[in-house]
Amino acid sequence: RERIEVNAKGQPIRVLRDIDAMSGKDLQLSIDIGVQLQAAEILRRGQLEPVELGSMSVQRALAKNNDLQAHIALGDDLVLRDVKDRLVPPESGAVVVMDIDSGEVISLVSAPMFDPNLFTGTLLTRDWRRLNSHPRTPLLNRATSGQYAPGSTFKMVVGLAAIEAGVISKNTQFNCSGDMELGNATFHCWRKGGHGMMNIISALEQSCDVFIYEVALKTGIRKIKDMAHRLGLGDVTGIGLPGEKQGIIPSHEWKLANQGRVWTPGETVVSSIGQGYVLATPLQLAVMTARLANGKQVTPRLVKSVGDAAPDFAPLDIDPYALAIIREGMFKVMNGGLGTARNYDLDKSLGGMAGKTGTVQVKRITKAQREEGIVNNIDRPWAERDHALFVAYAPVKRPRYAISVVVEHGGSGSSTAAPVARDILTKLMQKQG
């Protein structure tokens, strides 16, 4: 190889010296390019249909849509039609697929994407401006650096912490009437009429908020924080990619150090459903899911093999019975009669999957918007819509893969993110046989 001097524009000036190459160890990356490309396409299209760009009506619509113009300027000609018959760019978000036993990352998708070849030579100013000013920030690796409120995917953490602390058992029940009073505040369940009597399994199956509120207050934020860290949240994963974020798992100490104020019980309630200060990356959510699936300290890696090295993950030191309860709840999400993702399970011939949906509020619908008739997520500006999340492992009886999906401003985790995971795992498992 050569060491070359370049000018400020990246243009070669002269060769400084030649460096003799040295043989190294055999190295194979874990990313499966076939799965990577399929996962990216499935994420970007979601459940929407592509349109042909050649028609005059489409061209007229493009001329009025700044988001689409910025998207096409990146060289991407995929344009979709949403349920309101509007032309929209592909979905933005992230997908992470891991091998549970080895920790190998099979797919690491971030969308929107860009052509990395732009950086191999002289990067033109106009290309840099397009990338840097794009409204959906294609230069951000959402899989490792995107930090999102995990929403209801965090409920497994709370449930596991409560079981381990002896606060609840498999059969402990609380009544969900649709809301819970705490001091002068009222905290609502997503289901206005309430769910009735819930235990931890049915609460995960139906994603009951009030049950989790009650459990979190009795467990305490310190035990919840400890469990979150044991499952891989709140710390960088060590995957070795630049810019990886560690997320936030808040606590009394965190709030005092960062805001100079004391922690309140209401913040425990909000944190328990994965909102408030709680943040996680899609990679961390995949790690959490892998650890729940096999009870070990699974660590992600991008190198499939270096010589004969093989992982040997230590146990999580969590009661297997407690883990089994949480797994049963995740199974019911996909297979229970009232499971929030019951319509999106894997084909039984592939072994099915266990998962958890999450829908994260980005911004409340204002009174003015309601007066204008805006009451549904899809009617709002894209940047104000809820995020859609989903985590799962498969097959159920002998877990091999863990997946996390985040669709930015995608709406429902059930109807948007879960089918993305199903379709990706279907392709992967059919390929593997």
Predicted regions, residues:
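Short, gly/Ser/Thr-rich active-site loops of penicillin-recognizing serine hydrolases
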Residues: 309-314, 420-433
